Amino acid sequence: MATKNEEILRKPDWLKIKLNTNENYTGLKKMMREKNLHTVCEEAKCPNIHECWGERRTATFMILGAVCTRACRFCAVKTGLPNELDLDEPERVAESVELMNLKHVVITAVARDDLRDAGSNVYAETVRKVRERNPFTSIEILPSDMGGDYDALETLMASKPDILNHNIETVRRLTPRVRARATYDRTLEFLRRSKELQPDIPTKSSLMVGLGETHEEIYETMDDLRANDVDILTIGQYLQPSRKHLKVEKYYTPLEFGKLRKVAMDKGFKHCQAGPLVRSSYHADEQVNEAAKERHRIGEEKLGNEIGTDTNN
């Protein structure tokens, strides 16, 4: 028989999703295996994988291997001793983005604290290769803090992504428990320096709720992000990946997420996605700047013309 606490924390109905396994989804999954590529969508058990892969033509590639040197207590990605870098990975990612005809791609990476450059050179090369083969696809990067190595950050930002995403994850008080190898202030500095290096590139961060934070702490985190020129915020429900991970302390209702979004917009964020199933890459194609949106428009027009030509033939 469930305890009172377990009954309170049982997953609510609004966290149930309808799976969409259309051709886009199944084709992408097959290609990932054939190309020996990894996606955070799968590794981190993202609840939106069917919507993004099946409907929005977006995907999040995870590079620099599938094993992370850190062991954050909320994350489902494998941890341990990573493999050697795969120098052919940038080309394979770029080719896959082209074959899938993605509108928006997010390139994230495991933390590579074992590498002198934190993997920044291969990361930047991946962005460049994707851009070369896919000029109409917008590119978002989601790196770790690279151990606070700002030369590595400069290398990465020089590749000119369309969005720099670096997640604060939780409020200041909970950071040591949630992600012991990172620090709250280093995350803020990473975001600030990213904006200083490339002022025209939107910066973005994500916050999980349900770990025991208060509303006041959430608002303080919003203020800290805005004070460091962060443009975009996503807020989503923390879901426990396994019994080894941190427990969910609270399930926020859709109404509460709506209120958090309003507060964020009132505080000056240019864009905020907030909801039970929102993750840092959720609807990311809508968050790019005007230049990237124009590339989207041209790409969609080109795709429409190609489909029309094929139909006529």
Swiss-Prot record:
Residues 54-270 form the Radical SAM core domain. PROSITE patterns: RADICAL_SAM. Its cofactor is [4Fe-4S] cluster. It catalyses: [[Fe-S] cluster scaffold protein carrying a second [4Fe-4S](2+) cluster] + N(6)-octanoyl-L-lysyl-[protein] + 2 oxidized [2Fe-2S]-[ferredoxin] + 2 S-adenosyl-L-methionine + 4 H(+) = [[Fe-S] cluster scaffold protein] + N(6)-[(R)-dihydrolipoyl]-L-lysyl-[protein] + 4 Fe(3+) + 2 hydrogen sulfide + 2 5'-deoxyadenosine + 2 L-methionine + 2 reduced [2Fe-2S]-[ferredoxin]. Binds 2 [4Fe-4S] clusters per subunit. One cluster is coordinated with 3 cysteines and an exchangeable S-adenosyl-L-methionine. Gene3D superfamilies: Aldolase class I (3.20.20.70). It is found in: Cytoplasm. HAMAP family: Lipoyl_synth (MF_00206). This is Lipoyl synthase.
